Amino acid sequence: MRKYPVLIIVIALLFVLPLLITGCQSSRDSINGKVVEADTINEDNNEQKEDNKEEMTEEEKKAEQEKKIAERAALEEQRKKELGDFYVPLLPLDDEREIEKVEAKGLYVTGNVAGMPVDKANVEMYAEYIKALYENNSSKINELKSKVDKLNKFEKILGIAVATEINTLVIDVKDDNGLMTYKSDIAIVDQVGANQNVRIKDIKGLMELFNEYDIYPIARIVTFKDKNFASNRTDHAIQLKSGGVWRDNKGVAWVNPYDKFVWNYNVAIAKEAVLNGFKEIQFDYIRFPDNAKKYNPITDFPGRDGRDKDEAIEDFLEYARQELESYKVNIAADVFGVITKSWDDEPEDIGQTWRKMAKSIDYMCPMIYPSHYSTGWYGYEVPDQHPYGVLSAALKEAIERNASLENPPVIRPWIQGFTASWVKGYIKYNPKEVRLQILAGKELGINEYLVWNASNVYDPLAYFPIEEENNVIAPDKRQDIEKDLIGRTPDSVMKDYLSAEKNKVYSKMYLLTPIDDRVFDYDEFRTSIESLNLKLVKFDVKDYKVIDQNNAEVKLSYEYSQQIDDKVLRVINEDDTWKLIKENGIWKVKRPDIKPMQVEEGQ
């Protein structure tokens, strides 16, 4: 009688074991990473959900929407508690915007000008007048001249956008005094009195106007030069060690760039600007005050915690990027023109280092105004007299710096749209001088630009191509594969690299080393080169061969020495070949291992 249970168990196992084996196999497949079936199931489930959604009744759809609204309301209440006086709502649930990329060609507009009344008929009339100017239609010019003289600045700017290549306007949101140009609903903005001088009465109406004229709006936020905030919340200003608030030569107090309270203030204003319709946030004065040597000994920056100034700016931009990510907006930063040449914030000491800032932004906007360069820059006695030359030289430096980054931002320079009559030997900046700056960028593949004129007076003829632009071919479209974006051949890059090594200009070596062949941190890179204890005695670059668009070889000879105690090791190579690759459009040197072997005693 006891045999039957055993028989039943055996029969059961015969049925169950295959199922167990199949289950184990499925588990093993999952463990081994074979998740295609699971992904397929998920996709099927998602498709099923979509099908079900389509099959939902109107009542069910309404219930689902009400649920989303309730969840969002709860989230916003939570955010209000967390953000407090810095609270700004998220994008509306029904806002399905995507980040818009535009090849921007833009003009700067103050809050005063952007707040001027607009008659669309006047805008169209000015556009017609511009066309007549361009075509040299004297009868139409004479017909409209007396009328257009009566138009306000903003109507003329909009007319320029209608009639020329201008498609972007940079509008002050928080101005150079720290005041809002339109009324903000952010609690902290009201508390510090930043709403006291509102000039744009209808920000939504302004955005509708931009949409109508297909204008890309950029919100300029003057970040750390904010005398209003610094004066009203002195505990968040740059402090004097002796007590009280530090002020610059013009008596202006600055906020402390290390202070996260200040970060939250500027980021909140940026968020609200997005909600109002701006498609890009441009942080200006994203730096410490200049003349650092004068104020460094007497000032204190609470919250510094041993960080360099450029770390504070780097950290702020990364924080802003994270906070603005869900707002679907581009981020730009304005930097001094000299940042294209200086390294690690030296000697300026204002917190601006190209590679550190570039990691967290979409657009880098160096302010390359020829009038702002002193005698000797780029070999010019009066740089202001050379709009093309200054732009070309500075942008080549910018391109080289950008190429050292894994995900570089777009370079979009600010150019000079004004006459710098205070400069000794200045020239008048007419349309040709403005256009020569644009030409310099085009020749280097940089088609974007922003024009600065503090008075907002722009000559429309500056925004039509000149004859020299007709034959410009962008570097990446040229047939000459030997040259990189800034016109260098492999042998010239090799000479630059070895000259930098010989003279211990490690920053240049950093820029000309492929990204995967070095660390990102420059100090670590420099230490790694110095630790080799190699001295380049001499070199001679003989010839080069371009293998394809992105690879080349250079033949060279060189001599290195290495001092170890009382011995000198040398390596002499009369016929070596080094490889170069083109990365982000720039030729870079793949450095081989150099191992000195020959020993010379007692040298």
Where are these regions (language model features)?
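Exposed beta-sheet edge and beta->alpha loop/turn motif
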Residues: 547-603
